[in-house]
A protein has these predicted regions:
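Long hydrophobic alpha-helical segments typical of transmembrane helices together
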Residues: 185-209
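A generic structural-conservation signal
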Residues: 38, 152, 177, 198-199
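Hydrophobic positions within alpha-helical membrane elements
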Residues: 65-66, 163, 197
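GST-like domain detector, emphasizing the conserved glutathione-binding G-site
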Residues: 1-134, 140
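Conserved beta-strand edge residues that scaffold enzyme active sites
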Residues: 43-44, 182, 203
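GST-like fold's C-terminal all-alpha helical module
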Residues: 106-193
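Short, solvent-exposed turn/loop segments enriched in Gly/Ser/Thr/Pro and often Arg
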Residues: 16, 156, 202
Length: 209
């Protein structure tokens, strides 16, 4: 996304280089082809302005003129509403609620174990790997019916799942044969131009594109 960062813009994103949820936000920005300045921040080298803007001391922060957002889900929905093309959420309320619920499940069932994967407790790491592998395998059959997660169209749910799938090798997780539909789904995500555009230099090294 270096090319995007070099253009003048009123919108600024502060992100680290490795977190999956920050990557998900960058995917949305790339899908929308937003003119955005992306500042990659190291945890021990935060600019003073970020400390002033974000009361939760987290890095992920979007600034759009006078608006400051620091929750990933709010950022993604704001971007989808602010830049409606291409749409990443359904128009009708029922399907929109369904997709929000799916994102909630992704965060609860998958993202919730990621902190354990970075820990020093070997038992906790092994347990987190098993939970993530089992939960991913459980949703694999859904991709036999539709090209994207419970949908014919690419949505914010897929933007959240793509970073996880990209990091499986980094996490030391190998899907079983029953997870083949999920791996094929991941390959479709990785082939999208916006996905390759969204990668930080560190993320590019996770495995060959």
């Amino acid at each position: 996304m270096a090319g995007m960062a070099n253009r003048r813009s009123l919108m600024v994103l502060y992100s680290d280089k490795v977190s999956p949820i920050g990557h998900a936000v960058r995917i949305v920005l790339a899908e929308k082809d937003v003119n955005v300045e992306i500042n990659y921040i190291e945890d021990n080298d935060r600019p003073e302005i970020l400390n002033d803007l974000n009361p939760y001391n987290s890095i992920l922060t979007l600034i759009d003129r006078d608006l400051v957002l620091y929750d990933a889900q709010i950022i993604m929905e704001y971007l989808d509403e602010r830049f409606p093309h291409p749409p990443l959420m359904p128009v009708d309320p029922v399907n929109r609620a369904s997709k929000r619920q799916l994102r909630y499940r992704v965060m609860t069932d998958l993202y919730s174990v990621l902190d354990e994967l970075d820990g020093d407790n070997e038992i906790a790491v092994a347990n987190a790997k098993k939970i993530l592998r089992d939960n991913l395998t459980a949703i694999a059959p859904a991709f036999v019916q539709t090209p994207y997660f419970m949908s014919e169209d690419y949505t914010l749910v897929d933007c959240c799942l793509a970073p996880l799938m990209w990091r499986l090798t980094q996490y030391g997780i190998k899907l079983p044969m029953s997870g083949k539909p999920l791996q094929q789904y991941a390959d479709r995500l990785f082939e999208r131009k916006a996905f390759s555009t969204s990668l930080s230099a560190v993320e590019e090294e996770y495995h060959a594109i």
